[in-house]
Amino acid sequence: MNTLLVTGTSTDVGKTVVTAALTALARAEALPVAVCKPAQTGVAPGEPGDLAEVRRLAGPVPTLELARYPEPLAPDTAARRCGAPLLTLDETATAVRGLDAELTVVEGAGGLLVRIGEFTLLDLARELDAPVLVVAAAGLGTLNHTELTIRALDAAGVRCAGVVIGAWPAEPDLASVCNREDLPRLTGVPIVGAVPAGVGAWDHDRFTAAVPGWFAPGWSPRLPFNSDSPPSTWGFDTSQSGT
């Protein structure tokens, strides 16, 4: 079993839509895939959460949510406020390993060092010896946030599977266009995908048909980028639109 963890440079950068896109891409390659969201926050019991959105966009796949907290806060804060037990690293890693799939995609909460329980996504990546895909914003601030995230991965000895722009605008401003060129140069990690802004509102058929065009040719979630390899420049189509 291969595991790929998905983190963001911050909250609301498009992790769930990127997770759905990765899942759809794996399904298009006939790769058995499962998705885990260790902790869901800001959603009441019985309401659809991020995993429901992944299934809606990517299609029926096995999913696993280990904990849910009603307040939209960092998972450990939300757990403490409602008196729920904190997730542990051991139980989470065991649950991920127990999923019956050739590829398991694990979506974190917020950024790399947000506490999911008694641990962070970085801790989980080290425990699973799994690479991490970084979802970044397109505009101002992303150079600093992305480089900080990748430096934290490097310092911990965790492989980076690449950077994906989580919401590429239909009409990118100058900062976004410059960031597209500067991110690989500054981080040493290639941009392996760019998901158009707004595609999370699409239906399943439209979403899955478009997914292959959002990732670099030849890149696959089953073959994550090795950070020891030289970065490449992918000239993704900046005219893509999620409208």
Curated annotation (Swiss-Prot):
InterPro entries: DTB_synth_BioD, P-loop_NTPase. Mg(2+) binds at residues 16, 50, 107. ATP binds at residues 12-17, 50, 107-110, 196-198. GO terms for biological process: biotin biosynthetic process. Substrate binds at residue 41. It catalyses: (7R,8S)-7,8-diammoniononanoate + CO2 + ATP = (4R,5S)-dethiobiotin + ADP + phosphate + 3 H(+). It is found in: Cytoplasm. One of its GO terms (molecular function) is magnesium ion binding. Its EC number is 6.3.3.3. Homodimer. Catalyzes a mechanistically unusual reaction, the ATP-dependent insertion of CO2 between the N7 and N8 nitrogen atoms of 7,8-diaminopelargonic acid (DAPA, also called 7,8-diammoniononanoate) to form a ureido ring. This is ATP-dependent dethiobiotin synthetase BioD. It comes from Nocardia farcinica (strain IFM 10152). The lineage of its organism: Bacteria, Bacillati, Actinomycetota, Actinomycetes, Mycobacteriales. The gene is bioD.
